[in-house]
Amino acid sequence: MSDINATRLPIWGIGCDPCIGDDVTALLTRGEASLC
């Protein structure tokens, strides 16, 4: 899980807040990035 977050955070951190990194990862897993 840490490896996935570490890979996603730098990329999505630009458009999304790092604080919601976990939520973003969950959305990406479902294929839904509506928040971004």
Curated annotation (Swiss-Prot):
Pfam families: Amanitin. InterPro entries: Amanitin/phalloidin. The typical symptoms of amatoxin poisoning are gastro-intestinal distress beginning 6-12 hours after ingestion, a remission phase lasting 12-24 hours, and progressive loss of liver function culminating in death within 3-5 days. One of the few effective treatments is liver transplantation. Processed by the macrocyclase-peptidase enzyme POPB to yield a toxic cyclic decapeptide. POPB first removes 10 residues from the N-terminus. Conformational trapping of the remaining peptide forces the enzyme to release this intermediate rather than proceed to macrocyclization. The enzyme rebinds the remaining peptide in a different conformation and catalyzes macrocyclization of the N-terminal 8 residues. There is a cross-link at residues 11-18 (Cyclopeptide (Ile-Pro)). The keyword Amino-acid biosynthesis does not apply. GO terms for molecular function: toxin activity. This is Beta-amanitin proprotein. It comes from Amanita phalloides. Toxin belonging to the bicyclic octapeptides amatoxins that acts by binding non-competitively to RNA polymerase II and greatly slowing the elongation of transcripts from target promoters. Keywords: Thioether bond, Toxin. Belongs to the MSDIN fungal toxin family. Residues 1-10, 19-36 form a propeptide. There is a cross-link at residues 12-16 (2'-cysteinyl-6'-hydroxytryptophan sulfoxide (Trp-Cys)).
